[in-house]
Curated annotation (Swiss-Prot):
Residues bound to Mg(2+) 2: 196, 198
GO molecular function term, any single one: metal ion binding
The encoding gene: OPG089
Mutagenesis or variant effect for residue 33 to A: Complete loss of function
Organism the protein comes from: Vaccinia virus (strain Western Reserve) (VACV)
Function: Putative nuclease that seems to be required for double-strand break repair, homologous recombination, and production of full-length viral genomic DNA.
Family of this protein: Belongs to the XPG/RAD2 endonuclease family. FEN1 subfamily.
Name of this protein: Putative nuclease OPG089
Localisation: Virion
Cofactor remark: Binds 2 magnesium ions per subunit. They probably participate in the reaction catalyzed by the enzyme.
Cofactor: Mg(2+)
InterPro entries named in the record: Poxvirus_G5
Length: 434
């Protein structure tokens, strides 16, 4: 649930570490994302009676460790989550249909079991049938709500358990907001219990240490500004509850070491992080990049985004080139595109030294509007006359690639309005910098 891969990425980045749950006995309050834990428990049991028993046992165990447990419970409809709900219903129906077929198969097969260890085999198959039957029952969201509400009545008179209903807001969102309030009065976060990886995003909003738990593991999380950036970048690329992500891209532990991380979640930094491979513009579609980045920023910072119109999904190429269009268009306004490359270069370069008369004559000799082919030696000569170098540049201003003049950002990649080339795959590019 939530942001794909975020937990494994934070583990890879060493800010999230796994602890021995048995070594930590007491907490200053425990906050629970109820629905995520309820579903996790439900997937491990065979019937409602067992679910009730196990869930109550978990809560009572948390009371012993935290003194007081607050169960955050989703209630009401969240308007901006309609697309997410529609996708979940579609996925749930497919899962239900698959499990119904599996149930029919098991029900048929159990009738034909005979011979050696018949009773044991039938008993094992019956357990599977019971579990499938219960999972099919829970595939109906109304049944989930009814059964959860029934279980929660067991805590109505329990002074050690508070039921905190989150009207038209996600429970994990409200839970982390309340956890920040808890921190402001006690000086530490409560233990956070959730299986939803959006919780990790919200927990990245400040650099205070946090203890986060799911059903089987306990984590310590000490986020840095870089982790906050990574969490937001992962929400943007891989998607979160309200934004489906950048189609065609994914951040995983396998490619994390190739991605540049920053402290500030700005458009330039984001594009630099994404520039781990070459991209080519496939369509002329543009997207409102600022709106997308603002939404992710506000959501991650626990600002109230529930009145926003969530941004639509776009491809990673659409995001990147829309983000770069402003810089390219600004450059293009003073760029002679229709002349040969040496002339383009002379017009584009800002002199970094005095150019003497003999050098002006040399530059004049390079002006040939009939010659559309570029000579590498001419390019290097022009660069040198203007005070630039082609080797060992600390700051890259332009790159020349197949008669294309490309801009450079952070010396990390080159681009124009139709292609982006990462600096790690730039063997065929002539650098112009200083």
């Amino acid at each position: 649930m939530g942001i794909k891969n975020l937990k494994s990425l934070l583990l890879e980045n060493k800010s999230l570490t796994i602890l021995d749950d048995n070594l930590y006995k007491v907490y200053n309050g425990i906050f629970v994302d109820t629905m995520s834990i309820y579903i996790a428990v439900a997937n491990c049991v065979r019937n409602l009676e067992e679910l009730t028993t196990v869930f109550i046992k978990y809560v009572n165990g948390w009371v012993k460790k935290g003194g007081h447990v607050t169960l955050f419970i989703d209630r009401g409809s969240i308007k901006i989550k309609q697309d997410v709900r529609d996708k979940r219903r579609k996925y749930s129906k497919l899962t239900k249909d698959r499990k119904m077929l599996e149930l029919e198969k098991c029900t048929s097969e159990i009738q034909n079991v005979t011979g050696f260890m018949e009773e044991e085999i039938k008993a094992e198959m019956q357990l599977k049938i019971d579990k499938l039957t219960f999972q099919i029952y829970l595939s109906d969201s109304d049944n989930i709500k009814i059964s959860l509400n029934e279980i929660l009545t067991h805590f109505n008179n329990n002074e050690n358990v508070t039921l905190f209903y989150c009207d038209e807001r996600d429970a994990e969102f409200v839970m982390c907001l309340e956890a920040k309030t808890h921190f402001s009065t006690t000086g530490e976060w409560p233990l956070i219990i959730s299986t939803d990886q959006d919780t990790m995003l919200f927990a990245s909003a400040d650099n205070h240490p946090k203890m986060i738990k799911n059903l089987t593991q306990l984590f310590k999380y000490v986020p840095s500004a870089e982790d906050n950036y990574l969490a937001k970048l992962t929400a943007l690329v891989n998607g979160c509850d309200f934004f489906p992500g950048l189609y065609g891209a994914s951040i995983t532990p396998n490619n994390l070491n190739k991605i540049q991380l920053f402290s500030d979640f700005t458009i330039d930094n984001i594009v630099t992080s994404l520039a781990i491979k070459n991209y080519y513009r496939k369509t002329n579609s543009t997207v409102d990049v600022r709106n997308i980045v603002t939404f992710i920023n506000d959501y991650a910072n626990l600002d109230d985004v529930y009145s926003y119109i969530p941004p639509c999904q776009c491809t990673v190429q659409e995001f990147i080139f829309s983000a770069l269009d402003e810089k390219w268009n600004e450059f293009k306004s003073s760029y002679l595109e229709s002349v040969p490359l040496p002339c383009q270069l002379m017009y584009a370069l800002e002199p970094r030294k005095e150019i003497d008369v003999s050098e002006v004559k040399t530059l004049s000799s390079y002006i040939d509007f009939e010659n559309t082919k570029s000579d590498i030696d001419v390019i290097k000569s022009i660069s040198s006359i203007f005070g630039y170098s082609n080797e060992n540049c600390n700051t890259i201003v332009f790159g020349i690639y197949k008669d294309n003049l490309l801009l450079s950002i952070n010396s990390s990649f080159y681009f124009n309005d139709s292609l982006l080339i990462t600096n790690t795959k730039s063997d065929n590019i002539i650098n112009i910098g200083y």
